[in-house]
Amino acid sequence: EKMLAGCADIVSKLQGTEKFIPIQLKWWHDIAINNAIYFNIAAQQTEEPRQFRVSDNISQCMYNSSTCMYTAAQIAAYMGFQKIFLIGVDHHFHISQNNRGEIVVDNSVKDYFTDKYNEDKDRLYIPNTERSTLTYLAMKHHCDARNIVVYNATRGGKLEVFPRIGFDSLLE
């Protein structure tokens, strides 16, 4: 929610692209996006990955949890994809938090390829990588149950839930 609030005008003006936007942003925050395809999203109410919910009918509802990859996987499954390739999912941030709510700072990490990418990053959500790992475990569980294979093609990174595949091999 925080990310879109800061750039709603820019997103609204985008031409020639589909914009999947949670309807809750319109309902609760009065953020309307031109030509949006709105979807209903519901939060998870558990910390146990095998109890995380996933939607097989995204026209009714999708479930979120800590990372947009969880939502994207539901869209891909609904569209019939049997393979999902994660690219650029570092799963490691300059500033993050753990499950105790403690802030963790790693000065060796640069979050974006340019300092201008998110100039308002200090006001954005601080990711909880422990919760995100649980989310990726749930994503793997649900994809496995649907015979969908998820590969991590990220160069480097800290995400080790999915089997690795070399990024360059995707281009051969």
Give the ranges of each region predicted by the language model.
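Metal-ion/cofactor- or nucleotide/acyl-coenzyme-handling active-site neighborhoods
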Residues: 1-172
